[in-house]
Amino acid sequence: MIGMGETIMDIIFRNGQPQAAVHGGSSFNSIVSVGRAGVPCVFVGDTGADIVGRQTLDFMRANHVDTDYCPMRPDVKSAVSLAYLDDNGDASYVFYKQKPEAPKEWTLPQIGADDVLLYGSYFSSCRGMRPLVEDMLSHATAGGAIIYYDINFRSSHSHELVALLPTIEDNCRRSSIVRGSADDFEVLFGQRDAATIYDRHIRKLCPVFICTSGAGAVTVCLPHDTLRFPVPRVDDVASTVGAGDNFNAGLACSLIWRGIRKDMLPALGSEEWQHLLATACAFSGNACRTLDNYISVEFGLRASGLPV
């Protein structure tokens, strides 16, 4: 699996007091969980040439993530976020980071039909990173990989929506799976109903659409059907910061473990999707039980034995 995105240091607060500092970033969180689950993986991105950047790379390597395509850049300061948790473990954020800009040159990992590329968030739609993102998407398309796009559009970027929407639509068009939350689509389209969003906005761009809604049902919209699956209850929630990222990680791992390729996706039936989403929800639920942004090491060691 290949993850592409930003790296950031999350400082997590509860009741106004710092509780933990954890390495983060949407695709970053996913790829760490994939590495802990024993799936070969690589991260494409960058970090600053500073102590935070060095710790970030060391952390990825310790979790079996290839960092050959994530350079430390002297022109970049590592990003930091403050995540303030409410009583439900949901976070509101304050970000301290530079405007994203692609490096002057880069190399990309090999990618083939058995692989999954995961990307998304503001990183994938902002102008500064577009040259790198477009090159990676073309590379993954040529290799026949599953391209998994998590829109993950935060309300903090709503003032840029008009400028970013054409790029978001282009990302959808070039992807095999589009996922987003009901919150994302309320900001983007003023809609929360998955079937309506699919019919009006996604179907013409990408055949496979997954809409999550926190503890609510997961909806999978396909050309031939709309499927809804309940989400297992998680009682001991510590933080939901990595919930969606780990849903992505679990789904990607399950696709790889089950040998599902790009051309098989639109025709998958309800039973197959139930297997895929069970693993996705198991990853997400485990990550919600701690202040970390990823599955636990212990869960990762037994993850491949889940009923995938």
Task: Specify the residue positions occupied by each region the protein language model found.
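A short, aliphatic-rich alpha-helical micro-motif
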Residues: 110-112, 171-172, 203
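Conserved N-terminal subdomain of the carbohydrate kinase-like
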Residues: 11, 40-121, 303-308
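Alpha-helix C-terminal capping segments
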Residues: 29-40, 85, 254-256
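Active-site metal-binding loops of divalent metal-dependent hydrolases
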Residues: 5-7, 26, 122, 151, ...
